[in-house]
Amino acid sequence: SDNLAQAVGENLAEIACQVVEQVFGFLSQISAQQQQFESEHTVEQITATIAKHLPWSMQLLNHERLSSLMHDLGHMMSFTDGQIWLKYPIPAHLAMQLRQYSHNLNSSHDIAQAFSLIVEIIDQGVTQLVRDPKKKLKFNFMVDKSLAGVIGLTTQLGYKRLEKMGKQLNPEQAQAYLEHFLQFIPQKKLRIKL
């Protein structure tokens, strides 16, 4: 059971790191050198934290709770066009607003608003993919508080980086990032390729 929990934890950490790379990796490509360094540093901090804490937390689960977690995660995955996708529903108005901003980035205010929407959409996923499952797993008080702290720290690192980029990117760079991000939102679900 420990070997299974370790393997599950490592695989979940790998999936989580892929998600972070897909969300933030493109920012590094379109940014100025200093912004690129900051984005890469943020990604490294987040992925290192995930790689450290996710396998550890999974080792604390018995087989029944581990099976329940994997069952729920399986419902959030799909296989389309030869690719495995992780998906979660988002409110239609968020996707619509982001699409509108992607066609109308006329000012720094518009860019900042668009990046705030991206943070809101990502936070929907953090809740559905991380916070809600953590609650269902019913960790003991100390582990629960530790994980809540890790989740809070990593999300704030990512969100602050996105909000800062929303203030630093020019309209062309912001447009490129929005188009990159919108490719993950085909309808009312955000999909991330694994």
Segment roles from a protein language model:
Residues 1-194:
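Protein-protein interaction and targeting regions used for scaffolding, dimerization, and localization
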